[in-house]
């Protein structure tokens, strides 16, 4: 009798729950040994990885996959190098598990503190990019969590080949294979099962398009770490240094167009707009960026600037398109960001400390920056070593989610025969 998708996912979940208890108590040396052995296995399996990936690429082309998705799917030699190096870098990161902080004696005589512990079982749902298999598996393993990985059907062969290397690493370290499991079925019902198993899965991390994340957020019966959009802003204050403003606004938009930390709307104080917008517009036009602006922006820069609509202020373009709005003051800038932004990353360019501090305090986003490009909103750039994603939620993890974001804390209490009176 053929196993149903629900039965299959239940079997994976039960195995992951059991494995989570073993990986939670694994030593740092044991976890690092698994990571380094997996890196060696990847290095030794380049031909197998390439062959599996070529099969996925051929299937993708036959199914009419868009060029951008085919590019994400491809495991080039450089990307395999990056995966190998990524495993080795995670092995070098400090192990957060078991760390005790804030120990203090209380009047009763007991000593109370907090210990960092794994979350348990983490389900990762992602699309296209097989390198996410390594990112997710390595961070979950190092943070003492078991993980169930459900990649896109278009990358199934690549993910299987990568998972085989991870399994070799686990075996070398004498850790159970169930610490990292890849969902083998391409049936979409597997996603529905994974996100509705609170008895086996402690948290879900979806990485992919907006429709996937919306579905997971709507239907999940376990907590979700996510972000929906990256509608990021740069506000150029009246007290901005012109050179800094131009450099930051250029980089925030044109460094790369697709990432979620790319600026989508530029806000400029009316008192500085005539000095900063014309040179910026020239840079954007030279780089092929389509400009959409408010009435004052169009009056200043010319009719070739498309009239911005209400929808533009809400839009994450992930393309060479930029919305520009001239605002009367800091209050209007903050109000605009808190109304139309996605609570991801927003920046102010200003030499005025009180304006910058107000922006820092009042903009309700996961990352708020002063005189820096929004492109810095990244786990590696924040010194986390790696990230599993970026969260715009306020509970548990917020911003780039690295090792610590995949852990929780429990209270630990030390006594010496103490009883409560």
UniProtKB/Swiss-Prot annotation:
A GO CC term assigned to this protein in UniProt: cytoplasm
Q: Kindly list the biological process annotations in GO that this record carries.
A: L-proline biosynthetic process
UniProt keywords (A-Z) are:
Amino-acid biosynthesis, Cytoplasm, NADP, Oxidoreductase, Proline biosynthesis
Q: Which SUPFAM superfamilies match?
A: ALDH-like
Q: Which reaction does it catalyse?
A: L-glutamate 5-semialdehyde + phosphate + NADP(+) = L-glutamyl 5-phosphate + NADPH + H(+)
**One Pfam family from the record:** Aldedh
Task: Please name the InterPro entries in this protein's record.
Answer: Ald_DH/histidinol_DH (IPR016161), Ald_DH_C (IPR016163), Ald_DH_N (IPR016162), Aldehyde_DH_dom (IPR015590), G-glutamylP_reductase_CS (IPR020593), Glu-5-SA_DH (IPR012134), GPR_dom (IPR000965)
Subcellular locations according to the entry: Cytoplasm
EC code: 1.2.1.41
Which pathway does the UniProt entry assign to this protein? Amino-acid biosynthesis; L-proline biosynthesis; L-glutamate 5-semialdehyde from L-glutamate: step 2/2
What GO molecular function annotations does the UniProt record carry, in alphabetical order? glutamate-5-semialdehyde dehydrogenase activity; NADP binding
Q: Ion transport as a keyword?
A: no
Role summary: Catalyzes the NADPH-dependent reduction of L-glutamate 5-phosphate into L-glutamate 5-semialdehyde and phosphate. The product spontaneously undergoes cyclization to form 1-pyrroline-5-carboxylate.
Spell out the family assignment given in the record's similarity comment: Belongs to the gamma-glutamyl phosphate reductase family.
HAMAP family in alphabetical order: ProA
Protein name from the UniProt record: Gamma-glutamyl phosphate reductase
Q: Which organism is it from?
A: Pseudomonas fluorescens (strain SBW25)
Q: What is the lineage of its organism?
A: Bacteria, Pseudomonadati, Pseudomonadota, Gammaproteobacteria, Pseudomonadales
Gene that this sequence comes from? proA
């Amino acid at each position: 009798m053929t196993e149903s998708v629900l039965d299959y996912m239940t079997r994976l979940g039960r195995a992951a729950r059991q494995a989570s208890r073993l990986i939670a108590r694994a030593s740092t040396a044991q976890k690092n040994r698994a990571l380094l052995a997996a890196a060696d296995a990847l290095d030794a399996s380049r031909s197998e990885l390439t062959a599996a990936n070529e099969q996925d690429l051929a299937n993708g082309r036959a199914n009419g996959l868009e060029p951008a998705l085919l590019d994400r799917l491809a495991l080039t030699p450089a990307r395999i190098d990056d995966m190998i190096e990524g495993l080795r870098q995670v092995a070098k990161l400090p192990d957060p598990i078991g760390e005790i902080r804030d120990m203090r004696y209380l009047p009763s005589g007991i000593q109370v503190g907090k210990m960092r512990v794994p979350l348990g079982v983490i389900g990762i749902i992602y699309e296209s990019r097989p390198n996410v298999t390594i990112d997710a598996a390595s961070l979950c393993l190092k943070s003492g969590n078991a993980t169930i990985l459900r990649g896109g059907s278009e990358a199934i062969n690549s993910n299987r080949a990568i998972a085989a290397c991870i399994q070799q690493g686990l075996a070398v370290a004498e850790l159970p294979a169930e610490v990292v499991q890849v969902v083998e079925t391409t049936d979409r019902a597997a996603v529905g099962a994974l996100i509705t198993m609170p008895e086996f899965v402690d948290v879900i991390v979806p990485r992919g398009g907006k429709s996937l994340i919306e579905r997971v957020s709507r239907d999940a019966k376990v907590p979700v770490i996510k972000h929906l959009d990256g509608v990021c802003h740069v506000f150029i204050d009246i007290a901005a240094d012109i050179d800094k403003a131009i450099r930051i606004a250029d980089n925030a938009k044109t460094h790369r167009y697709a990432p979620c930390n790319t600026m989508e709307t530029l806000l400029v104080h009316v008192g500085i707009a005539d000095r900063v917008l014309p040179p910026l517009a020239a840079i954007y036009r030279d780089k092929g960026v389509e400009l959409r602006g408010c009435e004052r922006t169009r009056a200043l820069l010319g009719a070739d600037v498309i009239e911005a609509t209400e929808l533009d202020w809400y839009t994450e373009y992930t393309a060479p398109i930029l919305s520009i709005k001239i605002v009367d003051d800091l209050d209007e800038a903050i109000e605009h960001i808190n109304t139309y932004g996605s609570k991801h990353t927003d920046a102010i360019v200003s030499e005025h400390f009180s304006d910058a501090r107000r922006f820092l305090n009042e903009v309700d986003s996961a990352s708020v920056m002063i005189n820096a490009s929004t492109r810095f909103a990244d786990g590696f750039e924040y010194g986390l070593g790696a990230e599993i994603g970026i969260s715009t939620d306020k509970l548990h993890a917020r911003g780039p989610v690295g090792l610590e974001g995949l852990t929780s804390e429990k209270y630990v209490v030390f006594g010496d025969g103490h009883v409560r009176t």
